[in-house]
Amino acid sequence: MDEAFLERVERDATEFARGAGALLLEHFRRPLDVQYKSADRRDPVTEADKKAEAFLRDSISASYPDHGIVGEEDENTEHETPEFAWVLDPLDGTTNFLNGLPVFASSIGVLRRGVPVAAALFIPGIEPGGGSVYHARLNGGAFQDDRRLAVTDNPQPERGRLTGFPSFWLRMYAFNGGLRQRLGEVRSLGSIAFEMAMTSRGSFQMCMFTTPKIWDVAGGALLVNEAGGKVLTRTRRNGAWHPLEGFRPDAPTLDNLREWRGAVVAGNEALTAHVGQRVRQRSFAWFRFRRWLRQKVGLNQDATGAPLSNTAGAGNTEHPPTSSNGTGLTQRETRS
């Protein structure tokens, strides 16, 4: 692959992510129209998501008309099997965004035949209007703006360090070899892309996700790898872990990419291997049974009769297993 072309892709992805981040910040902590993808109000979409994705799609299509696009909010582009595909999550962490918490990301991952080759993630700053772009290209290192990034170097989890796990981790996972007591300070921040960025800079020693979707991790996976780390995945519940080097066989279609699912653990190489050997995921059947039982006895409703959120989810963000009625956006409100 032409190195100059790859540098251009990274540079453009960085500017596109910065532009999407600026759009998000224009809507942050302001009244927003909110729609929900499911009847239980667990998967919100805002006008900010849609405007950011439209900006990214327009920018990519203008600069790379022969590249494909896979986005969370809209359909794939018409390119069926493009050499390059841009995988977009315009706003990962929508619930945080809606509640005024600056813990979200706008994520871009660029794939060549399914292999990540460039990434750019906008991460907001604590101060209003601030933010950085975390970016990388294959074999080019990872950076926060101009500062080089590096994962932690501890070969095993350490107490006092931060670890990203899903909010339901105590129920979803079983641990061997005393790992549960040595995971460190567990956090679930509500944005997979944000947690992977924090892992790439060493603020998190590692992070783990149950079944994220491709747009959750396409950018962050390359970021962690280029920061000296390792990202492992497995597609069967307790199958063998292997390095996440690509998201499908050679020349995947955009539909292939959209359908990708897999557990992910990210951190330095020794740490991910250590954790991967000592963690086992429990069956989702138990959680489905518990949900059914709670519904039968009325424990899945609050005092008003409204359904409570299910926490047995698929990742650290707004993607738990759902019971969507298949009708798309079913609820609407304005959040001030």
Named regions from a protein language model:
Residues 1-40:
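N-terminal, positively charged, Ser/Thr/Ala/Gly-biased leader segments
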Residues 1-15, 180, 197-336:
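Oxyanion/phosphate-interacting regions
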Residues 32-37, 142, 182-189, 231-232, ...:
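Short secondary-structure junctions
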Residues 80-139, 143:
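DPxDG-like acidic metal-binding loop motif
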Residues 149-225:
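Phosphate/pyrophosphate- and phosphate-bearing ligand-binding catalytic cores of soluble enzymes
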